[in-house]
Amino acid sequence: DLIVTGVQTCALPILLKAHIGKNLFATTDPCVAASQDVVVFVTGTPVDEHLNPRVNDVLKVISSYIKHMNKDQLVVLRSTIFPGVTQIVENLLASALGSCKLAFCPERIVQGKGIEEIFNLPQIVSATTDAAFQEASALFSAIALKVIPLSTTEAELAKLMTNAWRYLEFAIANQFYMIVEKQGFDFYKILSAMKDDYPRAKHFASAGLAAGPCLFKDTMQLSAFHSNEFFLGHSAMLVNEGLPNFLVQQLEAKMGCLKGR
């Protein structure tokens, strides 16, 4: 319950009321996959204690559904996966089903704006076969603003790079925040002056906690893909994951010892 009570868009209650029990159903029964034309997996790839991707977590979920699937279905992967995993999933499905139609079409929406953005953002579409690409393109052309074709590995990298880029953006803002606040100045006053009618600073991020479910792990996955030589990503990790400790130190400087408070 704590997970599913997250941010809701304003249109969500209206849409749920209109569709639940009619053309929208929720179930934990994997058998329902057998009767579907399209099966979409939204299992993200976590990282382990060594910051390496746990690819088997994704494969285990897909494997648990295979006995309910068939070769005529379009299978779509939506969540972040390590580069090359789409091909591994294709081999897994083909081995069990004889052949498959597999696409990787990464979701690009931001939390709290899902309904708005799924219609207004372009959708990257990649697939392991022409038939799968055509079906996936038709599916998302009915929803998204436009379809952008990539190879599966290009699409996997695009998803990781997008999230790593955002993580780096937040790290820059957080580093500046710590530099300024440590010296007793107001970061947001300075940031406001920087952005005031100055187009090149228009998209400068605000400081803030950047852990979340995606950005950190996807930055580390990109690093793992590059033999752990993504030095900007590692520096961003030190900044972003170090911000909570900085905030506690700032509180202690103002309030004294926080033990027991």
Q: Where are the regions that the model predicts?
A:
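Single conserved hydrophobic/aromatic residue that forms the stacking wall/gate
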Residues: 1-10
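Structural/interface elements that position substrates and couple domains in central-metabolism enzymes
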Residues: 11-261
